[in-house]
């Protein structure tokens, strides 16, 4: 693949960064204007992706699908595009001119550019608006944790972005993740800036701000590294051109970056760290002017001029007598105090610019401050290249510094010289790759990692140039420990862990720095092990946004087809889903659950649905599950089974008294309502019938007839017809499956029992509401006698009505009870189809229910017959129970049979009292 055509080759360590604009004015009025316009400029910053397009055009895909195939295998070739030139090298390291587009800005507008860079960290945000201000103010006033409240929308934003992008636009997706974080950082920064200092809730917001800043830059790193790694994987079999013997430094380094992924990706890390520093430059625009004119050390110059006057009576303290750049060192004399302060401040800002990869801005600043000589010292890193060596019709200009090595040795020595300021030494240490002198000014994790990687790239490039470029004999060389260093990524982080700086060690243990470390190393397994440690150590204390990041990082790896440890990935997803459930992000749960293995997805979503109680919300959750391609039928079945099995109580034997129903508890109410999950989809009517039967069996065993009746009512009346219709629609020539057939029969058995029980309750209530015969008081008056006669007539009328209703109820309840006791085709709660799949628990419960319910029903029937004077029919119960056809005697215990015989004896005695024989027949004399 063609990797040529990079234009001017830049330094391996000093990138051609964007050029900002030089301020021409620095006045109190200017500062006030900059300060007043700060908020307005937040929304008007140039979007990062316009300045530093980390996704070159060849990587971008015009197709953005409306829906995402959640389980599609990734097509890596589509992710990167198939253009002619390697997209990776378009955004290569500082040697090739930085990952950014170089934009030369006019000097007069330098300060204006920097004023917008104050908000550089808060990129990709919407313009400032009144609505946003009102929202922020409301959040600040009402919420206990404004940061958490303001960032809550990120959970849904990330999912929407994930679903919007296909696997071929995965890097656009990562870029969008970064933009979402950037927008949120902008909002949180405004909340923090307007907060009252010292309030606890705003300290939480500041912590949230830092967390999201770290996430934002981690997504940036991820996109940069893995775009290059995937491109490398696609080109690993490519043949690279052999470097010519007389190749220039530029050509050699260009070839090195083409073939060596370590150098290339290390430079990407440097670029990434410099982009972070560039974001954090902040109020640099307010401090770029150090002198009123383009004259350096003007206070010293003024003092020296004054001393030449005969009338001078001021201080005679020692000062330099010459103002060339080397004078203070050569003469070992100081500058004026004000100049020394300005010099220290200038050097610190120059290092800040170089740390941010903004070398040209540093040079411009030097020129503005009258130190053109210092700007020249920052120019010597450019790689030498003479395009005229290979001939050509036109003479082209020579690039770079032919004496770059001498320049570099001078920089190294200057960095070693303790007479210079620590930041001046650090500047030239960075230029020469002198790690020892660079580290003292690196106080943070980012600074330290930048120093190591910058020096590593510089060293590897210098080694390549030394072995591949023919050079003139040079009497001096760079130190052996620099040129002979054996650099690896692992070695960098080992050195980092051995630092004596407490802050760096502490930051090294922070979650996002650990993630960044493993991303740089390309060690996905190591990263998964860290995730596992975090979950085992503080699963419930991990920040929600960190869990969201971990989840989407795993989904990113899966999209690229990279292997992650399955157990850890599952645990991360499960933990994130549990967080979404706790925080009530109902609309998001299904789409993350579908990335779990099917059995776990069913169990996890079913567990979530157990907590959903509102009917409309349940329907909504099932619709979301369908959209996410979850197995809705299995999930709803699992929900019902989970809830109905929560009661560990065993079937218990009924007492033989016709006691009232046991009350319905809250747990019972959950079991009743859970049937709703199975009635949304008509295709699940058979399952609804089976689960409803299972719940009602438990209720009947506990004498909770009202609860059982409520479950029965939950099952749509057309369910049996619907089951048969579905069987016909599927073109099944055979009868219903045995399980469905038996479930229908059981459902009818329960209906018959509930009807009999309800009718008995009506009969029992009516039986005990007999009209009371009026009594005549002793020695009544005539009026009282007349009133008594009227009451007797009314009583006789009421009694007649009551008796007629009682007879009707008695006939009805007898019929319904006989329907249960003499249930057709084998008896009540007995399956007809024996070819069904065995369900030992169900079979056991049905046998127990026969033993619990049928004897009690028999006793109730005897009570009805005996109470209504049908003694002869009472004795016929013995024939029914002992019948070999129905074999009801098998469900009676010895105690129950003894009690039944006792009741039959009482009925026989009543017949004897009526002058009949014990069986109710007339006595034949």
From Swiss-Prot:
GO terms for cellular component: cytosol; kinetochore; membrane; nuclear envelope; nuclear membrane; nuclear periphery; nuclear pore; nuclear pore outer ring. It is found in: Nucleus membrane; Nucleus, Nuclear pore complex; Chromosome, Centromere, Kinetochore. Disulfide bonds: none annotated. Changing residue 442 to Y: In GAMOS7; uncertain significance. The modification Omega-N-methylarginine is found at residues 60, 68. The modification Asymmetric dimethylarginine is found at residue 60. The modification Phosphoserine is found at residues 4, 10-11, 37, 57-58, 69, 86. The modification N-acetylmethionine is found at residue 1. InterPro entries: Nup84/Nup107. Residues 35-49, 55-66 have a biased composition (Polar residues). Pfam families: Nup84_Nup100 (PF04121). The modification Phosphothreonine is found at residues 46, 55, 64. One of its GO terms (biological process) is mRNA export from nucleus. Its main location: nucleus. Ubiquitously expressed in fetal and adult tissues. Keywords: Acetylation, Centromere, Chromosome, Disease variant, Epilepsy, Intellectual disability, Kinetochore, Membrane, Methylation, mRNA transport, Nuclear pore complex, Nucleus, Phosphoprotein, Protein transport, Translocation, Transport. Changing residue 101 to I: In GAMOS7; decreased function in nephrogenesis; unable to fully rescue morpholino-induced nephrogenesis defects in Xenopus; decreased protein amount detected by Western blot in patient cells; affects exon 4 splicing resulting in decreased levels of wild-type mature transcript; impairs assembly of nuclear pore complex. Belongs to the nucleoporin Nup84/Nup107 family. It is linked to Nephrotic syndrome 11: A form of nephrotic syndrome, a renal disease clinically characterized by severe proteinuria, resulting in complications such as hypoalbuminemia, hyperlipidemia and edema. Kidney biopsies show non-specific histologic changes such as focal segmental glomerulosclerosis and diffuse mesangial proliferation. Some affected individuals have an inherited steroid-resistant form and progress to end-stage renal failure. NPHS11 is an autosomal recessive, steroid-resistant and progressive form with onset in the first decade of life. Ovarian dysgenesis 6: A form of ovarian dysgenesis, a disorder characterized by lack of spontaneous pubertal development, primary amenorrhea, uterine hypoplasia, and hypergonadotropic hypogonadism as a result of streak gonads. ODG6 is an autosomal recessive condition. Part of the nuclear pore complex (NPC). Forms part of the Nup160 subcomplex in the nuclear pore which is composed of NUP160, NUP133, NUP107 and Nup96; this complex plays a role in RNA export and in tethering Nup98 and NUP153 to the nucleus. Does not interact with TPR. Interacts with ZNF106. Plays a role in the nuclear pore complex (NPC) assembly and/or maintenance. Required for the assembly of peripheral proteins into the NPC. May anchor NUP62 to the NPC. Involved in nephrogenesis. This is Nuclear pore complex protein Nup107. It comes from Homo sapiens.
């Amino acid at each position: 693949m063609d990797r040529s055509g990079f234009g001017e080759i830049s330094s391996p360590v000093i990138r051609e960064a964007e050029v900002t604009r030089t301020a021409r004015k620095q006045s109190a009025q200017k500062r006030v204007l900059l300060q007043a316009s700060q908020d307005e400029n937040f929304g008007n910053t140039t979007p990062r992706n316009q300045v530093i397009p980390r996704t070159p055009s060849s990587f971008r895909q015009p197709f953005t699908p409306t829906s995402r195939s959640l389980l599609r295998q990734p097509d890596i070739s589509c992710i990167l595009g198939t253009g002619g030139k390697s997209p990776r090298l378009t955004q290569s390291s500082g040697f090739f001119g930085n990952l950014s587009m170089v934009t030369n800005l006019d000097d007069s507008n330098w300060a204006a550019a920097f004023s917008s860079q104050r908000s550089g960290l808060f990129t990709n945000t919407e313009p400032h608006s009144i609505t946003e201000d009102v929202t922020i103010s409301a959040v600040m006033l009402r919420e206990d944790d404004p940061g958490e409240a303001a960032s809550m929308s990120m959970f849904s934003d990330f999912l929407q972005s994930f679903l919007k992008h296909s696997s071929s636009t995965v890097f656009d997706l990562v870029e969008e993740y970064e933009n979402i974080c950037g927008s949120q950082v902008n909002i949180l920064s405004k909340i923090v800036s307007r907060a009252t200092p010292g309030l606890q809730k705003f300290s939480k917001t500041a912590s949230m701000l830092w967390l999201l800043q770290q996430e934002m830059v981690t997504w940036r790193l991820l996109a940069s590294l893995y775009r290059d790694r995937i491109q490398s994987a696609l080109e690993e079999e490519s043949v690279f051109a052999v470097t010519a013997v007389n190749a220039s430094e530029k050509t050699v380094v260009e070839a090195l970056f083409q073939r060596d992924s370590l150098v290339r990706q290390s430079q990407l890390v440097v670029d990434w760290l410099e982009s972070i520093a560039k974001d954090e430059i902040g109020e640099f625009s307010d401090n770029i002017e150090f002198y009123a004119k383009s004259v350096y050390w003007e206070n010293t110059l003024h003092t020296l001029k004054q001393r030449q006057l005969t009338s001078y009576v001021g201080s005679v303290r020692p000062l330099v007598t010459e103002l060339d750049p080397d004078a203070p060192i050569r003469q070992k004399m100081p500058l004026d105090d004000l100049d020394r302060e300005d010099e220290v401040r200038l050097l610190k800002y120059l290092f800040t610019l170089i740390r941010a990869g903004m070398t040209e801005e540093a040079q411009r600043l030097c020129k503005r401050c009258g130190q053109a000589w210092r700007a020249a010292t920052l120019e010597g890193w450019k790689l030498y290249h003479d395009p005229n060596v290979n001939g050509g019709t036109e003479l082209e200009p020579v690039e770079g510094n032919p004496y770059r090595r001498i320049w570099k040795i001078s920089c190294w020595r200057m960095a070693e010289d303790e007479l210079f300021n620590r930041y001046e030494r650090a500047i030239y240490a960075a230029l020469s790759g002198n790690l020892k002198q660079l580290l003292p000014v690196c106080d943070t994790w980012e600074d330290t990692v930048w120093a190591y990687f910058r020096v590593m790239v510089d060293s590897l490039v210098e080694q390549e140039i030394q072995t591949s470029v023919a050079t003139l004999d040079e009497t001096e060389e760079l130190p052996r420990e620099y040129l002979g260093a054996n650099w690896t990524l692992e070695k960098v982080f080992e050195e980092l862990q051995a630092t004596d700086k407490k802050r760096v060690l502490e930051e090294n243990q922070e979650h996002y720095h650990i993630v960044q470390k493993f991303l740089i190393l390309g060690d996905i397994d190591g990263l998964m092990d860290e995730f596992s440690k975090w979950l085992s150590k503080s699963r419930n204390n991990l920040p929600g946004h960190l869990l969201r990041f971990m989840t989407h990082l795993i989904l990113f790896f899966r999209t690229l087809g990279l292997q992650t440890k399955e157990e850890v990935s599952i645990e991360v997803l499960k933990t994130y889903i549990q967080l979404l459930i706790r925080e009530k992000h109902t609309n998001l749960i299904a789409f993350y659950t579908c990335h779990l293995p099917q059995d776990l997805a069913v169990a996890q979503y079913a567990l979530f649905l157990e907590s959903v109680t509102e009917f409309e919300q349940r329907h909504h959750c099932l619709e979301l599950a369908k959209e996410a391609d979850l197995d809705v039928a299995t999930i709803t079945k699992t929900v019902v089974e989970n809830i109905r099995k929560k009661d560990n109580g065993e079937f218990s034997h009924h007492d033989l008294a016709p006691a009232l129903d046991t009350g319905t508890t809250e747990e019972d109410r959950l079991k009743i309502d859970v049937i709703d999950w199975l009635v949304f989809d008509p295709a699940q009517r058979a399952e609804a019938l089976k689960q409803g039967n299972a719940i009602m069996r438990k209720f009947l065993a506990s004498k909770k007839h009202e609860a059982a009746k409520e479950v029965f009512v939950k099952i749509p009346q057309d369910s049996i017809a619907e089951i048969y219709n579905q069987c016909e629609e599927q073109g099944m020539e055979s009868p219903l499956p045995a399980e469905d057939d038996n479930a229908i029969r059981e459902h009818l058995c329960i209906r018959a029992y509930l009807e009999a029980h309800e009718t008995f309750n009506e009969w029992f209530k009516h039986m005990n509401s007999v009209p009371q015969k009026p009594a005549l008081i002793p020695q009544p008056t005539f009026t009282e006698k007349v009133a008594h006669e009227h009451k007797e007539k009314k009583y006789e009328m009421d009694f007649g009505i009551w008796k007629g209703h009682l007879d009707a109820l008695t006939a009805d309840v007898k019929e319904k009870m006989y329907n249960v006791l003499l249930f057709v085709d084998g008896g009540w709660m007995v399956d007809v189809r024996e070819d069904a799949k065995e369900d030992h628990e169900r079979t056991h419960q049905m046998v127990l229910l026969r033993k619990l319910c049928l004897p009690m029903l028999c006793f109730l029937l005897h009570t009805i017959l005996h109470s209504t004077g049908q003694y002869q029919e009472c004795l016929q119960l013995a024939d029914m129970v002992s019948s070999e056809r129905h074999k009801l005697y098998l469900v009676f215990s010895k105690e129950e049979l003894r009690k039944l015989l006792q009741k039959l004896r009482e009925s026989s005695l009543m017949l004897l009292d009526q002058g009949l024989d014990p069986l109710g027949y007339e006595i034949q004399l």
